[in-house]
Amino acid sequence: MIKKIGVLTSGGDAPGMNAAIRGVVRAALSEGLEVCGIYDGYLGLYEDRMINLDRYSVSDMINRGGTFLGSARFPEFRNEDVRSVAIENMKKRGIDALVVIGGDGSYMGAKRLTEMGFPCIGLPGTIDNDVAGTDYTIGYFTALETVVEAIDRLRDTSSSHQRISIVEVMGRYCGDLTLAAAIAGGCEFIVLPEIPYTREELVNEIKAGIAKGKKHAIVAITEHICDINELAKYIEQETKRETRATVLGHIQRGGAPVAYDRILASRMGAYSIELLLQGYGGRCVGIQNEKMVHHDIIDAIENMKRPFKGDWLDTAKKLY
């Protein structure tokens, strides 16, 4: 019988994490459960830095970006002895189960705790939208708005100077954020990790656009594919057009969550409590066709693959 749960945020922060914490806390309290917040993710779990939360602890949190509990990367959590300390810390505080909000790296920690007999539920919190088993992750839609706004601003100055602009978008090894932002921002060219790319092919496409009369262009590219400053130099050399590179960086993680992220986070937070009360552990929450779903967390990490939105890319190419 679960009487008290813990909640933490782990990995890179994402807008809507506070709304998810709020959803967990208030749904748990409505069921008569106690809630303990863990500071700085798995690091705080290991260092026994926790605080009891009530409904007022999460007042005015639904609209705040970031995570008030904090987050930290803690690779030492792979060590079983470290995890044993974390479990003992939770047990001495009377915590019976844990809700983990984060990406697939955070899920791995939850999986390992579950394998050691401590029930965990994972909520997908990352702007990258790269977690399997869910159509969307908490923070993705807010980051999308941020990226599109940046592209709109770049278009203004690119048009004024008849310039080629390259914008690097987060996403790690998933192109969802780049692809959606490129369509919404009207980008002329898109470079994604899912599609083989050569800079020669990109330059040929840009030259073809110039031949059609394009005065300026925006290239959206997912991070980790190449050095975009070097790419900008190469494009300028080959096209004789001024080319500038912009790395959006961590501004994509900040800001108040948009309405959909607040709703998604609230629904997922409340659903995690339903699952725990039904006796589930080692599960991760997702949304598919606007319905809450749950999967084995091992499947989400190791076996399930996110489908690539090839039809979206086809649409984008028609609009170049």
Swiss-Prot record:
Q: Which cofactor does it need?
A: Mg(2+)
Which UniProt key words apply to this protein?
Allosteric enzyme, ATP-binding, Cytoplasm, Glycolysis, Kinase, Magnesium, Metal-binding, Nucleotide-binding, Transferase
| Entry superkingdom | Bacteria
Q: How is its activity regulated?
A: Allosterically activated by ADP and other diphosphonucleosides, and allosterically inhibited by phosphoenolpyruvate.
The record's EC number reads 2.7.1.11
Q: What is its main location?
A: cytoplasm
Q: Which CDD domains match?
A: Bacterial_PFK
Which of this chain's residues are annotated to bind Mg(2+)? D104
Gene3D superfamilies given in the database record? 3.40.50.450, Phosphofructokinase domain
Quote the catalytic residue positions: D128 (proton acceptor)
Q: Where in the cell is it found?
A: Cytoplasm
List, alphabetically, the GO terms of the cellular component aspect. 6-phosphofructokinase complex
Q: Which residues bind ADP?
A: 22-26, 55-60, 155, 186-188, 212, 214-216
The terms under GO molecular function for this entry are: 6-phosphofructokinase activity; AMP binding; ATP binding; fructose-6-phosphate binding; identical protein binding; metal ion binding; monosaccharide binding
Residue runs in coiled coils? none
| Pathway linked to the protein | Carbohydrate degradation; glycolysis; D-glyceraldehyde 3-phosphate and glycerone phosphate from D-glucose: step 3/4
Q: Report which reactions are catalysed by this protein.
A: beta-D-fructose 6-phosphate + ATP = beta-D-fructose 1,6-bisphosphate + ADP + H(+)
Q: Where does ATP bind?
A: G12, R73, F74, G103, D104, G105, S106
Task: Give the GO biological process terms.
Answer: canonical glycolysis; fructose 1,6-bisphosphate metabolic process; fructose 6-phosphate metabolic process
- What does this chain do? Catalyzes the phosphorylation of D-fructose 6-phosphate to fructose 1,6-bisphosphate by ATP, the first committing step of glycolysis.
**Matching PANTHER family, A to Z?**
ATP-DEPENDENT 6-PHOSPHOFRUCTOKINASE, PHOSPHOFRUCTOKINASE
Which family would the database say this protein is a member of? Belongs to the phosphofructokinase type A (PFKA) family. ATP-dependent PFK group I subfamily. Prokaryotic clade 'B1' sub-subfamily.
Q: How does it assemble?
A: Homotetramer.
Which HAMAP family does the UniProt entry name for this protein? Answer: Phosphofructokinase_I_B1
Protein name, UniProt field: ATP-dependent 6-phosphofructokinase
Q: From what organism does this protein derive?
A: Erwinia tasmaniensis (strain DSM 17950 / CFBP 7177 / CIP 109463 / NCPPB 4357 / Et1/99)
Q: What is the lineage of its organism?
A: Bacteria, Pseudomonadati, Pseudomonadota, Gammaproteobacteria, Enterobacterales
What's the name of its gene? pfkA
